Amino acid sequence: MAYPLQLGFQDATSPVMEELLHFHDHTLMIIFLISSLVLYIIMLMLTTKLVHTNMMNVQEMEMIWTILPAIILILIALPSLHTLYMMDEINNPLLTIKTMGHQWFWSYEYTDYEDLAFDSYMITTDSLKFGELRLLEVDNRMVLPTDLPVRVLVSSEDVLHSWAVPSLGLKTDAIPGRLNQVTLTSMRPGLFYGQCSEICGANHSFMPIVLELVPLKYFESWSASLA
């Protein structure tokens, strides 16, 4: 989860988020090298008094600044494509959940179970218990099993919303009349928080998302008690 004054990403909870963190570090390293080279050239130009009279027609230099950016773009594009394909790949999900955005709450329907559906509203500040997080707690959490592929279908009943859980690397737009899908696999149990990430009206800030990831046997007990 996030902490006060945190500058980095949340700890990765899924393979997708781990890939995103690796890609971020890879891209940041390339940006750092480019920035260092540009700053070095600027300092060199500001401090040196030497003049190259043939600078206007140097084919070697033109080849370098054409080929080098192409190589850099390839180094960025290849891992980017790998991560994108990994995020879109859905192989035999063992559970499918339909998530609907409303103004201003979420509703969840476990399509593999009969009559297992509920709405999820934010708990107001005056109703919080000791240790609960302000603007992040809900009355009904989305409970999922760990270490199993889960498909989440996302749509909206009214306006644009966005279902996002940063520690799992998830952010999917909820669009009225359209069904988007995303897959998630949690590597450890716990509580994971998210929020609506698309401005959707006056109470946009009051649409938290809470995922409770538990071992499979506890999930089966929970689903049996509600179904």
UniProtKB/Swiss-Prot annotation:
Cu cation A2 binds at C196, E198, C200, H204. Residues 1-14, 88-227 are mitochondrial intermembrane. It comes from the Eukaryota. Its EC number is 7.1.1.9. Keywords: Copper, Electron transport, Extinct organism protein, Magnesium, Membrane, Metal-binding, Mitochondrion, Mitochondrion inner membrane, Phosphoprotein, Respiratory chain, Translocase, Transmembrane, Transmembrane helix, Transport. GO terms for molecular function: copper ion binding; cytochrome-c oxidase activity. Binds a dinuclear copper A center per subunit. Its cofactor is Cu cation. InterPro entries: CcO_II (IPR045187), CcO_II-like_C (IPR002429), CcO_II_C (IPR034210), Copper_CuA (IPR001505), Cupredoxin (IPR008972), Cyt_c_oxidase_su2 (IPR014222), Cyt_c_oxidase_su2_TM_dom (IPR011759), Cyt_c_oxidase_su2_TM_sf (IPR036257). GO terms for cellular component: mitochondrial inner membrane; respiratory chain complex IV. Cu cation A1 binds at H161, C196, C200, M207. One of its GO terms (biological process) is ATP synthesis coupled electron transport. Gene3D superfamilies: 1.10.287.90, Cupredoxins - blue copper proteins. The modification Phosphotyrosine is found at Y218. It is a multi-pass membrane protein. Its main location: mitochondrion. Component of the cytochrome c oxidase, the last enzyme in the mitochondrial electron transport chain which drives oxidative phosphorylation. The respiratory chain contains 3 multisubunit complexes succinate dehydrogenase (complex II, CII), ubiquinol-cytochrome c oxidoreductase (cytochrome b-c1 complex, complex III, CIII) and cytochrome c oxidase (complex IV, CIV), that cooperate to transfer electrons derived from NADH and succinate to molecular oxygen, creating an electrochemical gradient over the inner membrane that drives transmembrane transport and the ATP synthase. This is Cytochrome c oxidase subunit 2. It comes from Mammuthus primigenius. The gene is MT-CO2.
